[in-house]
Amino acid sequence: MRFFIYLIPILSRIPLAFINLKNIMIIILICIFILGNYTMYQKKPLMLLFCSTFVSPFVMGKTIETTNKNILPEIVVYGDNNKSLSSVKTLSSDEISKTPTSNGNITDYLRSNPHIRYENSDQNGFQRGEIKPENISINGADPNQSAYFVDNVNINNDLAIDSSIFDGAMQVVPGISHTQAYFFDATMLSKVEVQDSNISASLGGFMGGAVIAKTKQYSGTDSIKLKYRTTNSSWAKMEAGDSVQKILKLVRPDDVGVAELQPKYNKQTFNILAEKRLNDNLGMVFGYSRRTSSIEQNRLIGFDKDANNKAQLDKQNHQRLSDNLLLNFNWTPQEKERIEFGLRYSNYKELKYFKXNINNNVSDYHQALGATLAWVHSFNSGVWTNTLAYDRFQDKRKSSSNSVEITSVLDEYYEPLYNFEKGGYGNSQLIQDNLHFSTEYVMDPFYLASTEHSISVGGIYQATKYQFYRPQDVHSKIILSTLKSDGSMEEPPTSTENTTSKGRVKTSYQNIAIYAEDLIKWNKFELRPGIRIERDDYLKNNNIAPRFVARYHPWDNTGFTLGLNRYYGRSFASLKLANGILKLNNDSTRQHQNFSSLKSPYADELSLSFDQNMGNFALKLGYIHRDNKNRIILKREPIQGERKTSYINGHPFGVDIYTFQLNNIEPWKLGKTYWTTSLGFDWLNTKRADVSNEFNPNEPVYLDGKLMTRSQMLQQVNSSTEDWIARLGIDMTIPDYNITWSNKVYMKAPIRSYEELDGDNGDGISRFRSYHYGRHTQWDSSIRWQPTIRGKHSVYMQVDILNVLNKTRKNKVTTISTSDEYGVYTPGREFWLEVGYQF
C-alpha cells in the first residue's frame, strides 16, 4: 500500500490528454516493474538504511525555463555536473558514424584513446570471423576492473570473472561470458565517454576507469535510419605461413569448440533506429540491430579404417549471432520535470561443435535484459535525479545430450591413434539479477564569501542475486581401446565412469555507496574535493575513497592540474557462487574457501597534467601514477600433497602512464575542404605480473630453458607487452559534396613478452619462452558519401579499409606437433561496405 502512496504525486501530474489505451498500458507496465522489484527487495536492511538516508532533504521547488517545449533534453548523467576537472574523452554519434571500425561494438571505437589498451593488444588475423567486443584495460589495470555504465546504470557482468577457476570443467558450465553484459551496436548510442583519471566521486566499481554510454533519446524530430554493413574473408588479406597452409583447408575447432583458424567467413549487420513523437510531451526511440557471422569449419564424422584410420570430415559452419533491442520513452509532464523509461535487450549466441565430437551440437548464449526508470525534477536550489533499474544477465549452454562417451584408441604398442566422443555435456546456466537505485542532488552554483560552490550529493544501492542451474546429471564414460595388428579390438576395453550432479546454487550480494563533492572556484583556481563511502555484505569492508583535483589557470589559455584519488574496484561477489558450483561438482582440485578474509581491491592515483591552447592548437601533457593493491587473483598451491587453486589478494603493482595529446581546435579550411587532426602518444610502464594468473613469485619456472623463479622471469621481460603507442587522426570533409574521409594511424612499440609452453614434463615446473616482435604500423581509413535526395531523405555509402598498407606482424607462435609450429599474425587489409537510408 505504501508503494501506491509514493506514486500518487507522480500520477496526479499526468494530463488528461495523455490518458488513452496505449499510454495506460505503458503506465501499467511501469507500475508492475516498480512494484515487482520493490516487493522483491523491500526487506533488505541496506535498502531500508539507504531510503531513510535520502528521503528527506528535497523539499524546494523551481521551474526550469525552456525555449522549446518540443525539444526534450536528456536527463542528467552522473559525473556530468562537475566533470570539467575530470579527464574525459567523449565520442559523439557523429564521430562514431565516421570512424573506421570492424564490428561496431562500443570498445571498437576506443582505439584512439591514449589511456586504453586492449586485453589482446594485437588482434588475431586467423579469427576475423568473430563479432564479440574486445576487453579493454584502462591505465594498466586488469580488464575486469573497467566499469561499464549505460544510462546511469552499471552493466558489468560479474559472471565473466570466474571462468578461470573452472579450467578442466568447462563443458559442464556455460562456455562463454563477457565483462560487458550488453553488446550494443554503437549506432544506438548518442555518445560514449571514457573517464580515465580524476574521476568524479559519483562513479565507482573500478580500478582502471569508466566507460559511460548514453543510449539514443528522442531528439524532437521524427526520423528513421536504416543501415546494412558487410564483409567476408574474400575481402581480406590473411598472413599465413607454409606450416599453417596445409591445415587451413581442413580446419577444425579445438576441444572446447573455439574456432582457432577461420580462413573463410561471412559477416553481416542490419540496423534500424526510429524516433517518433507520440504527443507534445512524449517521444519514443526504437532501435534494433542484428549482427551475424558464418565461419567455415570441418566436423568429424568418423574414421576410415581402410585409409589408416584417417579422420573423415564434413564442412559445417560455426555461427555467431548478436541481437540488440532498445526502446526509450521520454516524457516531460511539465517543464520542471522529465521522466525516462527504457527497455534494453541483448542476445549473443554461438552455434558450434567440438573437435572430436561426432554427433552433438552446442549453443552458447550471453544474454541481458533490463529496464530503467529515471525521474528528474528541478527545485529552487538545484536538480534532483533518481534512477531505478533492473537487469538480468544470463550465460547459458544448451546441448542435445547430457551423456557423453569418450573413446581413445591405442595401437598395439599403446601409442595413441585417434580419439572421438559421442553425446554431450548437458544444459547449464548462470544468472545475475541486479536491482539498482540511485539518487543525486546537484545544487545550483552559489557564492560563499569570494568563492563559488557547486555541490553534488548522492547515493547508490544495488542488490544482486546470482544463481547456477544444471537441470540434469551429466554422465561421462571414458573408454580406452587397443587396436591389434590384425585390425580387431582388444577385449574387454578399459572404461571409467563419472557423474556431475544436477542442482541449483544461489547466493546474493548488496552494496551501498554515498558520495559528495564540491566544485569550488576562486580567482584562477578550481578545486573539487569529494568523498565516496561504500559498504557491501560480501567482503564486509567499509571503503572510504577520497577524491581531490585542483586546477590553476595562470592565463586564459593555460592550465595546470593535480589530482589525488582512490578508486575501489569490483570485489567479485560472484566468486561465492563459483565456490558453491565447485562443491556441487565435487571438485577436489579447488580449495573451497570463506572469502571474508579478502580485502577490497583499490588503486591510489596521483595525476599531473598541463594543457595549453596555442592559436588553433590544443596541447595536453599528462602523467598518472597508480598503485594497484589487493587485487583478487587465482592462486595455485600444494595442499596436503594436491595442487589446489584458491582466491587471494595479490601483490601490489605500480603503473606509470605518460601521455601527449595535440589537436586543432577549429577545422582548417583548404579550398572546399575542412580538416581536423589529432596526435596522441602514450608510454605505459607497469610491473604487473600477467602470466596466466599470479602464483607464488618464488615458484620455480623455466624461461628459455633456464631455471629461475617467477619473479626473476618477470624482471627479464616486459610485463605490459608494449611500452608505447602513437596515434594519428586526420579527418577531411567536403560539405558541398557530402563527403567525409576519416583516417586513423596507429604505431605500436615492439612486443617483448613470453608465453607458456604446453606439455607435462613430470616435474610440475611450468616452462615459458620469451619472444620479441618488431614495431607495427596500421592505417585505417573510411570514406563516406551521403547525398540528400529530397527534403529529409538521404542515402549514404561508406567504405572502411582497415590496415590500408597491409602491414602485419607476428604476435605469437602456435605448436602443431613436436617438430612443427606456425606463426599467428595480425590481420591484413580488410574491406567493409556499409549502405544506409535516412528520412
From Swiss-Prot:
Its main location: membrane. GO terms for cellular component: cell outer membrane. Belongs to the TonB-dependent receptor family. GO terms for biological process: siderophore transmembrane transport. One of its GO terms (molecular function) is siderophore uptake transmembrane transporter activity. It holds the Pfam family Plug. It is found in: Cell outer membrane. Residues 221-839 form the TBDR beta-barrel domain. Residues 80-216 form the TBDR plug domain. It is a multi-pass membrane protein. Keywords: Cell outer membrane, Membrane, Transmembrane, Transmembrane beta strand, Transport. This is Uncharacterized protein HI_1369.
